[in-house]
């Protein structure tokens, strides 16, 4: 098991480019199964979760070719349906959460999908009900094989339907959407997720011949078509990585420029960091973060403590709350971090407390952070990364700490961040992989 050794206290300086968005590319790769024609995807990040899904596609019989440093082509002309029933395939699915989004394309195009309970982060309960109920509403049958621990989903031809989702699930909406584009008739999805990832998926599917309207809203209408064709698609920059770099700059008192961020797709992320007192400027499609010796958390107009909470888009993505919590440990003032959507993502705060942070964990969803105003540095420590987002938050803490820190289980970080130590070392960090 690999680890990072981080020498804290070094300022960063220079330019850094965000990778392609992990949450988008997992959906896009699954969507290539909807056509027998070639689909070319640009700006694919070289990270563990994505590479595992690409390898899974190869094993399914999809022709995958690496066309450039971050460009792949996919041609699902001869999918091996027998392999999809093998224990090897099902075992791989169980270790990759993104595999759940294979259900919609497989059922829509081939009439059948088998999948085991998918893996991924251990950040609390992530229900699959939205996926299953939505695809059932399109006419699919679900059967759970208790002896093998797998779900079998079958359908002769999916039928369009109206559905009101009980939660604005990003992956659930994507799965239903990918199934509905080849269904007979019209499908209406109300309370659909509308994150930029979903907007990108919708636009790609429309270029492939789908008929989707209501893009960027929570009401999607899909008129089913007989078949889709090939296309080209470019993945957006990863907004989570952009936010992570803003947090790193603040914690290490650094001046950096984050290049080509697709600013219009960042939503309220920049404003959320400004509420913590962090200065940043939009320069074209870049974000410039000046060096700040201190930053002060804002208060609400009535003087009450600032609250930073996640919410479905256009609210703040839950994937950045771990970073914002760490950033607040060195701010002037206090903030309540409210993680509404998952109940275990704050369970890494004990590690920050061991490093000297002042944090009160109120319950599994809420933590109050009392900032040090950079008056007391965090201390280097031996740490373990429990999930992707906590892992990057701990890395930020270690980079700002006094002394040396070690982070183990960095495979979790590798799942979501491409060559993170190489890119950060290039702008002044001191991180060694051992």
Curated annotation (Swiss-Prot):
Pathway annotation from the record? Cell wall biogenesis; peptidoglycan biosynthesis
Principal location = cytoplasm
Task: Provide the protein's localization.
Answer: Cytoplasm
Q: Identify which residues the record assigns to the active site.
A: 121
- Top enzyme class, one word, equals transferase
Q: Does the keyword Ion transport apply?
A: no
Q: List the disulfide bonds.
A: none
Q: Which InterPro entries match?
A: Enolpyruvate_Tfrase_dom, Enolpyruvate_Tfrase_sf, MurA_subfamily, RNA3'P_cycl/enolpyr_Trfase_a/b, UDP_GlcNAc_COvinyl_MurA
For this record, an example GO cellular component is: cytoplasm
Enzyme Commission number(s): 2.5.1.7
Q: Which residues bind phosphoenolpyruvate?
A: 22-23
What catalytic activity does the UniProt entry give for this protein?
phosphoenolpyruvate + UDP-N-acetyl-alpha-D-glucosamine = UDP-N-acetyl-3-O-(1-carboxyvinyl)-alpha-D-glucosamine + phosphate
Q: Which Pfam families match?
A: EPSP_synthase
Q: Where does UDP-N-acetyl-alpha-D-glucosamine bind?
A: 97, 319, 341
Give a yes or no for keyword Cytoplasm in this entry.
Answer: yes
Recall the GO molecular function terms of this protein's record: UDP-N-acetylglucosamine 1-carboxyvinyltransferase activity
Q: Which UniProt keywords apply?
A: Cell cycle, Cell division, Cell shape, Cell wall biogenesis/degradation, Cytoplasm, Peptidoglycan synthesis, Transferase
Which Gene Ontology biological process is one annotated for this entry?
Answer: peptidoglycan biosynthetic process
**Protein purpose:** Cell wall formation. Adds enolpyruvyl to UDP-N-acetylglucosamine.
Recorded family membership = Belongs to the EPSP synthase family. MurA subfamily.
What is the official name of this protein in its record?
A: UDP-N-acetylglucosamine 1-carboxyvinyltransferase
Organism in which the protein naturally occurs: Bacteroides thetaiotaomicron (strain ATCC 29148 / DSM 2079 / JCM 5827 / CCUG 10774 / NCTC 10582 / VPI-5482 / E50)
Taxonomic placement = Bacteria, Pseudomonadati, Bacteroidota, Bacteroidia, Bacteroidales
């Amino acid at each position: 098991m690999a680890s990072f050794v981080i020498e804290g206290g070094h300022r960063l300086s220079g330019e850094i480019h965000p990778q392609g968005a992990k949450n988008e590319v997992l959906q896009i790769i699954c969507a290539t199964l909807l056509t027998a024609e070639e689909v070319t995807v640009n700006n694919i990040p070289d990270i563990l979760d994505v590479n595992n899904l690409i390898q899974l596609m190869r094993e399914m019989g999809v022709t995958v070719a690496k066309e450039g440093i971050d460009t792949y082509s996919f041609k699902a002309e001869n999918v091996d349906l027998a392999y999809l029933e093998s224990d090897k395939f099902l075992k791989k699915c169980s270790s990759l959460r993104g595999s759940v989004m294979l259900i919609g394309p497989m059922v829509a195009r081939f009439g059948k999908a088998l999948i085991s309970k998918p893996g991924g982060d251990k950040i609390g309960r992530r229900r699959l009900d939205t996926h299953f109920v939505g695809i059932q509403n399109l006419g699919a049958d679900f059967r759970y094989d208790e002896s093998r621990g797998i779900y079998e989903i079958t359908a002769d031809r999916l039928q369009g339907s109206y559905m009101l989702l009980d939660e604005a699930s990003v992956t659930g909406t994507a799965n239903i959407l990918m199934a509905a584009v080849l269904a007979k008739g019209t499908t209406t999805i109300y309370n659909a997720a509308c994150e930029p990832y979903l907007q990108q998926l919708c636009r790609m599917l429309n270029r492939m011949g789908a008929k989707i309207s209501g893009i960027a809203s929570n009401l999607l209408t899909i008129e089913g078509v007989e078949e889709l064709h090939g296309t080209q698609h470019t993945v957006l920059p990863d907004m989570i990585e952009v936010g992570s770099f803003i947090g790193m700059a603040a914690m290490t008192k650094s001046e950096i420029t984050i290049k080509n961020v697709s600013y219009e797709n960042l939503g309220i992320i920049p404003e959320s960091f400004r509420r913590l007192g962090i200065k940043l400027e939009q320069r074209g499609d870049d974000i410039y973060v000046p060096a700040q010796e201190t930053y002060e958390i804002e208060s609400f107009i009535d003087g009450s403590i600032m609250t930073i909470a996640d919410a479905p888009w256009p609210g703040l993505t839950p994937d950045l709350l771990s970073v914002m919590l760490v950033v607040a440990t060195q701010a002037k003032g206090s903030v309540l971090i409210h993680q509404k959507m998952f109940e275990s993502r704050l369970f890494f705060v004990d590690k920050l407390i061991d490093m000297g942070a002042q944090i009160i964990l109120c319950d599994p969803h809420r933590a109050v952070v009392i900032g040090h105003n950079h008056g007391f540095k965090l201390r280097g420590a031996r740490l373990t990364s429990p999930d992707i987002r906590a892992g990057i938050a701990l890395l930020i803490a270690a980079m700002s700490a006094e002394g040396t820190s070690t982070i183990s289980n960095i495979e979790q970080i590798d799942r979501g961040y491409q060559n993170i130590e190489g890119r950060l070392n290039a702008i002044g960090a001191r991180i060694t992989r051992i």
